[in-house]
Amino acid sequence: MRRSNPITPARLGRSAEGLPFSEDFGAPYHPSAGALAQAEQVFLRGTDLPARWAGQARHVILETGFGLGHNFLATWAAWRRDPRRCERLVYLAIDKHPPAPADLADVHRDSPLADLAAQLIAAWPLATPDLHLLDFEGGRVQLMLALGDIHDVLPGLQAEAHSLYLDGFVPARNPAMWSADVFKRIARLAAPGAMAASGHADSAVRDGLVRQGFEVRATGADATVARYAPRFQPEPPRGWRWPHAAAREALVIGGGLAGCAVAQALALQGWRSTVIDRQAGPAQETSGNAGGLMHGIFNAPDSPHARWFRAAAMHTARNAAAGLAAGELAGTLAGFLRLDERLNTTQAEAQLSAVGLPRAWLAWLDVAGARAAAGLELPCGAWHYGAAGWLDPAGYSRWMLQSAGDSARWIGGTGVAALRGPRDGAADHHGGWQAIDRHGRVIASAPVLVLANALDAARLLPAHCPPPGLSAVRGQVTRIPAGTPGLRPPRLTVAGQGYALRLDNGDVLVGATTQDEPVGIDGAALRLADQQRNLQRAAGLGVLDATAAEFGTTLLPGRAGWRAVTADRLPLVGPPIDLAQLAQARGGRVRLDAHRHQPRCVDDRSGLYLCTGLGSRGITSAALAGRLLAAWVSGAPAPVDADLRNALDPARLSK
């Protein structure tokens, strides 16, 4: 797995002419004629935009150096003005040294695109080595900002770009940006017929493009224009053949966090979905607790777990921000404390420095600082996560489903007894999947099917797919009423051995127990022993007096349910394994590119996907898992790099 490198913000100055100047590369960001003029004349005109995106469902632009954002803003403005614009504009940009928010605001202070610049600045992410998803225009314009060295970022991108903005400081100042390897990897991401434009006419730019199959159409004193026309175009890997591209409809089985997140994400890609659940309303099972934690994970190696949950937490914070601000969601993301009794301040700071994450995302608090932040007599120091805390999972699920608008249809109170798929001879008008009720009637049909129904996904998988390897883990939470003698509500959500969060009405939710236990009717009943364990842990956090933790035989409000947990504690997102393809792959000749051809259920006869196994961190994972699933289904650029996509891919179970 790729190890993340710390992100160093740009060192911005001014040239003698007053132009924004990079202290890192010793060059101005744009020519004296102006950044927006260069964007219009070199990049938009050079790639024949906006004409080439007319009538497209999605147009993807790859920019190799985001800089100060002028090219993005000019392209966004052109999209806004164009009555024949594409349905969705995806702008995938890379930057090694992103500007600090204050510098970005200063550069665009008097911009003629002040409205768009203000939106960009308001959405500007923390400088972490991740792929940041910033949505504008209701999701119809998406900036995917990949922060990191281009040599680290390009190998992990999964996209098909129609236009290429080859921007960056001149080859003499930044030769690594214009290396043969960079051009090779850019060509891998280029769609047939993609247009490339650069503000440089150096031989390094021209020759690099020609060697990778580009036809250089025009060069000038300060520009290069080329078209991608390779003599050989490799066949896409099996896992990237999305079925029925013309019929953008999907069935989603399961209306909890995962299913509602999938519906929201599919809607952002222009897909319609039908969400089916056995309960009358969304999130009535394990996703129905009054509150749950939302936070990232940190470790010094910056492992796949840490990278996934950091990216997922940042995306969830952005996704839920509008609902929280409008009072449509219960919860708060004002901060979260994770106790760690193993570390002292010196050790914690050494770990943090090794990864180089910004302190606004993660900081270490010694015991005094942790106690002051939580308002509790905590036993040790803690990691403080900035944009983290708790959300109401049921309310969040409903909010995501509602945000999909007319693109999502809800069918509740209806159990799916069986599925009928392409291999079973389903004969609906799409030739795809049918959900069948217990009477043998068709509930709904679509060319694509997503199983987002937690543990129940195994029951519905076709015979040619192995079980997904999910374990049932029972958990119980306890709700302590406000005003209970000895109760001290935490100022911030806190977790250690157990967790405690203050609900909006002053009640405190504590939990949660963890028991490997099969799903059963009796298990849904609250257990006094589990409540006692929760209260004792709350006392250990300082939320309850030790004597108040003994409630005898009084059963407090609470909830019990089962989590769907994978062995590696990462979700399952993507097509399930196809056993027939797996046997063929293991028994036949080994291909040199076998790693690109996983035995997945994505072909002309399938269109089956999983989004399950979110475990105890469903609130954190759901939204980004939904976006990843939607990328699988629609062919949109993946919202995470290849390593993380592979870490969540159900095909990992075939190894």
UniProtKB/Swiss-Prot annotation:
Keyword Chloroplast: no
Biological-process GO terms, alphabetical: methylation; tRNA wobble base modification
One Gene Ontology MF term: tRNA (5-methylaminomethyl-2-thiouridylate)(34)-methyltransferase activity
Cofactor names: FAD
SUPFAM superfamilies xrefs: Nucleotide-binding domain (SSF51971)
Highest taxon of source: Bacteria
NCBIfam families on file: MnmC_Cterm, tRNA_MNMC2
UniProt protein name: tRNA 5-methylaminomethyl-2-thiouridine biosynthesis bifunctional protein MnmC
Species the sequence originates in: Leptothrix cholodnii (strain ATCC 51168 / LMG 8142 / SP-6) (Leptothrix discophora (strain SP-6))
Lineage of the organism: Bacteria, Pseudomonadati, Pseudomonadota, Betaproteobacteria, Burkholderiales
Chain's gene name: mnmC
